[in-house]
């Protein structure tokens, strides 16, 4: 079953299961109207959960919204393609967008509000940035040097606008999750950060909005990422040192002609710094180009 059919199924299954007789989901486009509504909910003593997204939602996002729905009185989803986290040669303009589709899915999952601002609502030139050093300098940060500065900035702004009790992030973006946790701790945000498991296609490919870029041939080739994850998991449980483990993963990827490795690394789960063996909790992560499309995947190992 393809992703669109599965999303349609999610919509149908959840449409009558949200506990609401009719839809009351709101759509806001400005900071002022968003804050006004959330303040009203908080005045009633309601808890608020936030699911930050860049839209073009898939089943991974749906899992975050479901978890948020379970744990909070109010579910807020932000739907904003954040320009500050894209480099000058990256896919900002090409990034997939379909707000009508996103809205339908959010409504079916019981979201109470979608915040979908224009870039001009979120940023005024010149504007301040938030950055987290060290954690953002490895893995994706090495080849996307401005990415996490943009992520931290927009997430900080969303936290101030929505003032959530909890915020939900997927573990597929494991480095992002670690950076957000560090930022929340360092800047004393009174927000619980909830990490949610990677959601995969039936054949193992991690869900991503960028999967839509892939041709049928590239889609098959992209399975080298999940195959490399499996090889890495087997190696780490066998006690194989990092260098050999990463070599096994690279060999799986390099066997696919359409794949080009950006990085394959083992890092400390907290500091994001490279380690030589799994004698602590580690993250094994990769970024791989399939054709022109950059995909990421990872797995964690807890000690």
Model-derived segments and their meaning:
Residues 248-303:
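Phosphate/ribose-recognition catalytic cores of enzymes acting on nucleotide-derived substrates
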